[in-house]
Amino acid sequence: SLMSLLFAGLLAFVPSLSVPSAANAQDRGTPFGEWRYWGADAWSTRYSPLDQIDAENFDDLEQAWLWRGDNFGPSPDYILRSTPIYADGRLFTVAGQSRAVSALDPATGEVLWMFREPHTTRWERSSRKSHGKGVAYAEVDGRGVIYLVTPAFFLHALDAETGLPLEGFGAPVPLDGFDETGTVDLL
């Protein structure tokens, strides 16, 4: 019967599927020390295979640079709760109550670019100024993209290399200062 042939074909096909092995699960972690997610990787393992720092040399570490994030926005924000993302050789973080995004050179602490959302009445009235303290990273069509949800309920997509709003993402926001692309109004 036709049903028997379909079932037999399915049985012949299933063994050819690639099934994740236990070894693959143990390969989780961050490639080349990158920390592309809040918890290091998509599984939130908080594990890095890097071994330059260990219990024997930890006490020998010295501060390489200092980056101040308390002066981003209309008033100082002394409670910086952001987990930086490390991808494509850059650190990405947010600072200030407006959640300004900065890309930093991890070797020097130099600011490579910064993105600030235009000031809006929605931000002024937001009860979320102390929440939403991070960014997300993804590769889209071969390039890095930084995503940010702000206290004013806008979702921004930024080119990870330049910090410019992502072309073709979102729709124009009818408020002063917003680019024609790169933003989604979440309200």
Regions found by a protein language model. Give the residues of each.
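Hydrophobic/aromatic beta-strand positions that recur at structurally equivalent sites within the blades
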Residues: 53-56, 104, 158
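Repeat-blade elements of multi-bladed beta-propeller folds
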Residues: 32-39, 77-96, 100, 126-154, ...
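Bacterial N-terminal signal peptides
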Residues: 3-19
